Each structure stands twice: as structure tokens, then as C-alpha cells.
Amino acid sequence: MYENKMNLEFVSKSQNEAFARVAVAAFIAQLDPTIDEISDVKTAVSEAVTNSIIHGYENKEDGIIKIEVEICDGEVTIEITDNGKGIEDIPKVMEPLYTSRPDLERSGMGFTVMETFMDGLLVESEKEKGTRVRMKKKFNILS
């Protein structure tokens, strides 16, 4: 059971990445996070949305990215979903420095950043059907 929930949907334009991270940060502000915690969440959301745009939709601006954020007992769950091309080998793409787009000079650190800044990361994907990234972060609630 969640205490609060938000859903957001937008087209896969790179300009919307900043909007997504600010919207999620504004929503979790109700937990009174530290500046570092907000920065961690914004960075993780930015990486996931950027992956959807660049890899899932291959920079095509007609895809849809969905974000669902739930707060329950001081824990935030963020799901970012696309209906893009999917990931064939999830363990491979989660290796640090691996990139499927060296032509774009991508660093291959997106999933590593998400794992580092969040308390939990789960990636589910099906080829040609899309990808869902689920991230969790626990916040210390002051009474």
C-alpha cells in the first residue's frame, strides 16, 4: 500500500529529461530529503530517461516514456518504462563502461550510476517490447 503516488508520461525528446528529473525531485520533496539525496535521485532518473531516449527509442522523438513514483514508509520506488527496442543481454549492458552506442561517445556508466546512487535497481526488458527500470531509495523520516 502506498502513501502517495505520481504518474508522469512524456514523449522521448531529450528536452524532457530535465523535466522528468525535476518533477520526481519535487514529488519526493515531501520526505524532506537532503540536498545529496535529491541530487542522487535526480541523477538516477536522468540516466534512466536518457537510456530510454538514446537506446530504447534510438533518439526518435515519437516514443512514450512513463514514470511512476510511489512513496511508502519512507521508501521511494521509481519505475521508468519505455516501449522501445528492449535490451537483449541485461547483465552485459549493466557492466561498467559497456555501451551499445560508442558512435555517440556514450560512457557506458548509466546503470552503474543508478546502482551507486539508489538502494535498489531492477531492470526488466524484452526485445522489441521495451524496458522497465525500477529503482528504490530509503529516506530517514524525522518525526
Curated annotation (Swiss-Prot):
NCBIfam families from the UniProt entry: spIIAB (TIGR01925)
One Gene Ontology biological process: asexual sporulation
Stated role: Binds to sigma F and blocks its ability to form an RNA polymerase holoenzyme (E-sigma F). Phosphorylates SpoIIAA on a serine residue. This phosphorylation may enable SpoIIAA to act as an anti-anti-sigma factor that counteracts SpoIIAB and thus releases sigma F from inhibition.
Gene3D superfamilies listed in its UniProt record: Histidine kinase-like ATPase, C-terminal domain (3.30.565.10)
Protein name from the UniProt record: Anti-sigma F factor
Its EC number(s): 2.7.11.1
UniProt keyword list: ATP-binding, Kinase, Nucleotide-binding, Serine/threonine-protein kinase, Sporulation, Transferase
Gene: spoIIAB
Molecular function via GO: ATP binding; protein serine kinase activity; protein serine/threonine kinase activity; sigma factor antagonist activity
Known catalytic reactions: L-seryl-[protein] + ATP = O-phospho-L-seryl-[protein] + ADP + H(+); L-threonyl-[protein] + ATP = O-phospho-L-threonyl-[protein] + ADP + H(+)
Pfam name, any one: HATPase_c_2
Record's keyword annotation contains Nucleotide-binding: yes
InterPro entries xrefs: Anti-sigma-factor_SerPK, Anti-sigma_F, HATPase_C_sf
Family: Belongs to the anti-sigma-factor family.
Organism of derivation: Clostridium botulinum (strain Alaska E43 / Type E3)
